Amino acid sequence: MVGRGTLIVIIGYTILFGLTARYWTRVATDSVDNFVQYYNETTAHSIAVSAANLGGSQLFSNQPSDRSFQFSGSMSGGEYSVELDSVNPQLLVMTATGTYPPSGLTGSITDTVRVQFGTASFCTFGLYTGTMNNLSWDTGDTIWGSFHSEGTFNVEGTPVFYGDVTTNNGVTGGGTPIIYGSFQSGVSIPMPASGVSSVRTAAASGGAVINNPFSPAPFDVYMTFNSNATVTYRTSLNSTDSTVALSSLAPNGVIFVNNGNLHVHGTVSGQITVAAGGSSSTGLGNVYIDGNVTCNSDPRTNPNSTDMAGIVAQNNVWVESDNAYLGLPPANPPVNPLIEAAIYAQNGTFQCYYQTNSTYTNLGSVLVYGSIANSFLGVTTDPTAAYGYKPEYRFDSRFSNNAPPSYPTTGTLEILSWYE
């Protein structure tokens, strides 16, 4: 009996140890397989990310004219491929893949990185200026959003900047600015000569172009935006107002006055860009803001508002009187005008029409809630601050990621999204 019991115990332990050994062998094998799988996945991902960086470097360095390329190669024991495609004139998509081990081998894994590139819009700046001329930021000045000067950054006192500051030619003056963001010198972002012409092209392709029939004779268009998504307008050659739906007048949201001036105010419902082109020598290509320009859904209280306006001039954008719309002398300029828009003055500036007229005192502030880009920094008041408007510029954060229709771009590509 003892011998039989001992034998049973031995057989039992033998079976138990056999099963245990088999289990731990399987665990060890699975661990190795899992490690190999993880190594292959992470290596394939690293190759894909590196390939995306190679593609980005080639794109930013060479700026291919056909806006597309394709290449492949070997890396880290695996292989990669990069392909760039143009979705539309403002959007490029790059697809980078990494494979490890190389395709055809056991356990081969492929990972993909997709990157979207787009041209940066000028409305991403809180304030952009080609040159500051002899003007300087000083104590009491506050700039919201990023600021760029393509010339020098002139500073006196302690102005405050709530955003990144960049300049092409360094800092002048003895000031000590307070910058709640980064500062970088030697950054060149020129204003392209094609900014306004690109808007005209967009207006001619699905928008509205209002031509001056007697160019270079004076020609003015007077336009009022209505909160019901219509626009009322007339020209200096026709005293009768016409009211039409914006979607009918300009389906793509772009209106261009060719060889003329534009006078504009009202409440924008929808998304619109209005522009004026023409030669400064004939006094054309200007936009006159003759009253409040607001969004139907106020972005100051509703950051999700989809109403958006762009104001583009080949030369200057002026703040003017409401009476200009009525054809009367500008005797009563608006007090505390509000402009909710992105403003772009390609060869000129944004400034106040009444800056040196002693008749216009106690006008308050001009509040621009949006973005300003101009060739040179303009003024809205005289040096004593007695006339004109005190400037108050606030950046509309919606413009960080969205722009009015066909709004001018810097021509410089930037990464819009990176998907891994």
List the predicted regions and their residue ranges.
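Aspartyl protease catalytic domain
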Residues: 183-260, 265-267, 278
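Sequence/structural signature of small/polar-enriched beta-strand/turn repeats
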Residues: 16, 161-175, 185-194, 292-307, ...
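Beta-strand/loop motifs with alternating small/hydrophobic and polar/acidic residues, enriched
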Residues: 2-151, 419-420
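Protruding loop/beta-arch "assembly-hinge" segments enriched in small, turn-prone residues
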Residues: 392-420
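Short, ordered "entry" segments at domain starts
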Residues: 88-93, 99-208, 249-250, 254-256, ...
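Extended C-terminal subregions enriched in glycine
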Residues: 302-369, 373-386
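Long, well-ordered mid-to-C-terminal structural blocks that present hydrophobic/aromatic surfaces
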Residues: 247-320
